[in-house]
Amino acid sequence: MSALLPPPRTGPRLLNQECLTRTEDGERLHALLWHPGPGWRMASSAVLGGGIAERAWVLNAQVAHGYRRTDPARHLADLARAAGAGGTGVGLMTAADVSAAARARDGGVEAVVTAGISVRGWAASPEEGATGAGAPGTINIVAALPVALSDAALVNAVMTVTEAKVQALLESGLDCSGTPTDAVCVAARAPQDGAEVHSFAGPRSEWGARLARSVHRAVLGSLPAVAPR
């Protein structure tokens, strides 16, 4: 059980991210760092810090098109360390310009989405899957809830995020379910003695509905002007 923490923030800056800039491979690149500190549990599919665990920060880093490094987790960890992020965290990467991220909020839940959709398609494709990590193109979704969720609810929240993403893509006229490298990170407060731990985060639960709406709006706002195919 974590140490006693201040009441969760439900104001407009729950996901208060810092935009960082660096030059790498001759390109000017950006990264978004959210560093809320202790007291957060995250469920993520990210290459760095994925799974379910307490995490202290989330980094969403832009990398160059044609990225060829074979150690993305180490690369992300080095970037986070250089930015002053201590402890363990979550690292996502994308070739999209993360400084153009879209944000949305609903009832205390917040979502930040960066989107690059040049390589997109349907999840159930007849093509054989490749081995290893795919090239970063990617819709990256980071969402935060000001309440505690059980492990099952965190997994449920990732499902809700994915469903809301696909809904937004279809409503935008895009004939796809996403890109092959999409990543998700859902953050919720760590459980405290005597505080409620929510067991559900599906799209018809109280907090899941808020999560779905915030992600849906953020994905819609993040999509570049691309002709449907």
PLM region spans:
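Alpha/propeptide regions of enzymes that mature by internal proteolysis
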Residues: M1-R229
